[in-house]
Amino acid sequence: MIKRREFSISSAVGAAGAIAAGWGLGALPLAAQAQAKSYKEGSDYLVLDKPAPTEAPAGKVEVVEFFWYGCPHCNSFEPQLDAWLKTAPKNVAFRRAPVSFRPDFEPHQRLYYVLEAMGKLEELHKKVFYTIHVEKQQLNSAPLVAAWAEKQGIDKAKFAEMYNSFSVSTKVRKATQLQDSYQVDGVPALGVAGRYYTSATQAKSMDRALLIATHLVALPRKAA
């Protein structure tokens, strides 16, 4: 996990990070089911003093992944997260929130939301990670991001227009506000239902953080 006070762009780009082995997380082993009963507020997960805003529709519980494209741990977490999403509770409404711990994180935030707006996110999200962590290309400025997008076949003028658009700027601002609402201190991290927060710091591993997230998804229903 990259903590807010520890990272640097150069070190993150330089460390590819081994791809962690993901596991299904669907039919949990009995030991994991028993362990769920022992998850503790304050150690395994945190409860926000003030609820964070959510975008989940009625009847759904929002799970947010906080990430940074330059983070090797976020890159390694992708297969684990993909496996969890395939077997996550059906009432989960999942979304990602790119963080900004420094002003020079903003190009990655804008890239994410431009790809989303142009319908290219599913196709290119993982390729951004690959470009940074395997090909060792830095995408930490607007010109570098724009040049990369053009290589992916995206119209240069349309990308530039969207990159600087009001809608993308609004999403970037809201993502940073959400990060602050959850008091995110490192990535990857998970926010649940606008009320709960867990990460490798609390859970001791992101595998376990996903188990805790599954447990937390059920808590709003129990509390209702």
Enumerate the language-model features and the residues they cover.
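Structural microenvironment flanking redox-active thiols in thiol-disulfide oxidoreductases
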Residues: 87-118, 122-149
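Extracytoplasmic thiol/disulfide redox context detector
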Residues: 2-103, 218-224
